[in-house]
Design a protein with these regions (language model features):
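Conserved nucleotide-sugar donor-binding
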Residues: 154-167
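Active-site-proximal specificity loops/subdomain of glycosyltransferases
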Residues: 44-92
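Short internal beta-strands
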Residues: 32-40, 128-129
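A glycosyltransferase accessory/donor-loop signature
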Residues: 7, 164-330
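Histidine-anchored nucleotide/phosphate-binding helix
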Residues: 12-27
Length: 330
């Protein structure tokens, strides 16, 4: 099994906890090779990462992404180089690797994942779980409302097919057109340039924060997802989660902060306690004053009104503002 992560030094310890959860739940897997596309990883974190891999008798290789030549359009002070490195996994990894599992650093593996790794690729470039976004959110980056928008936190990647894809050309075209409206640049680039090349996984392979913090009806109100999973599929995923994805979601605080109140934070803490970072002191997360006041004010309203306002903001006002802004700038 070949697995990749991408991280700068700030997230290296979270990647390490994720890696420990991967090893802990896949002990019977004959071989696991982890490749970290690292950006200026400190000596201290490097040593701890290698220590964790050695403890489980697994292989870890840290690849310096600063040696990677990215398309000029991707050079930006807003995003670390590691954020885009997964787009070039086919170039950074040994050429005899034909498939790889990509995991975000905020993923916790809570079960055996060999079934996922051995999933048939069926000539798709990427297999992933659908993200919970509206039709307007897709349209702002040129995706038709009925087309798929994936969450890129967990991806089975077909490297053989990626090697034949005109990556630099398609990235340059996409960024030229949509740079001004992208909120999550690497995820939106992947969704934009690989449309029609996705295979869809059941949601238990990427159980995101919103699954556990909101009911299905609340999710529908807040996100207005289009062509999404059924309530039954989401409920099954919550009961049979193989991976938890601690995504940002409204005012929910992620579990590596001291003031987290997530109802599944204990899963993260379980693996933190058996990792080389078990002594890390958790800091409290501080929200920007404007966002905090707005969200607190919304929270004081009756729940249906709060959900309606959040839904209008996330599913319509924000993406349509981006679309109008883009048209004006042309």
């Amino acid at each position: 099994m070949n697995v990749i992560y991408a991280s700068d030094d700030g997230y290296a310890w979270l990647m390490g906890v994720s890696m420990v959860s991967l090893f802990e739940n896949n002990r019977e897997c004959k071989e696991i090779n982890v490749y970290l596309f690292g950006d200026k990883i400190s000596k201290e974190n490097e040593e701890k990462l290698y220590q964790a891999a050695k403890q489980y008798d697994r292989n870890l290789e840290i690849i310096d992404v600063n040696k990677l030549k990215l398309p000029e359009k991707l050079y930006s002070g807003r995003y670390p180089k590691s954020a885009f490195s997964r787009l070039f996994a086919f170039d950074l990894l040994p050429q005899d690797i034909d498939r790889v599992l990509y995991l975000d650093c905020d993923i916790i593996v809570d079960g055996n994942i060999e079934e996922l790794y051995n999933h048939k690729m069926d000539n798709k470039i990427i297999w992933a779980v659908k993200d919970c976004v509206s039709k307007a959110y897709k349209q702002k980056i040129g995706i038709k409302g009925d087309d798929v928008y994936i969450n890129t936190g967990v991806m089975m990647m077909n490297l053989d097919k990626m090697r034949k894809f005109p990556m630099e050309e398609r990235i340059t075209e996409f960024v030229d057109h949509y740079a001004g409206v992208m909120d999550y640049a690497d995820q939106e680039i992947i969704n934009g340039i690989f449309q029609g090349e996705f295979g869809i996984l059941p949601p238990q392979w990427n159980v995101m924060t919103q699954f556990n913090q909101y009911s299905y009806s609340q999710l529908k109100w807040i996100r207005h997802p289009h062509h999404y999973y059924s309530a039954e599929e989401i409920e099954y995923a919550k009961r049979h989660a193989r991976m938890f994805h601690y995504t940002t979601c409204m005012l929910n605080v992620r579990p590596w902060f001291g003031n987290s109140r997530l109802n599944n934070a204990h899963v993260f803490n379980r693996y933190l306690r058996i990792s080389p970072w078990k002594g890390v002191a958790k800091k409290n997360m501080n929200f920007s004053a404007g966002k905090y006041k707005t969200m607190r004010a919304l929270a004081l309203l009756p729940e249906p009104i709060t959900n309606f306002c959040l839904g209008m903001l996330h599913a319509y006002l924000k993406p349509y503002y981006s679309i109008i802004k883009q048209k004006i700038s042309k």
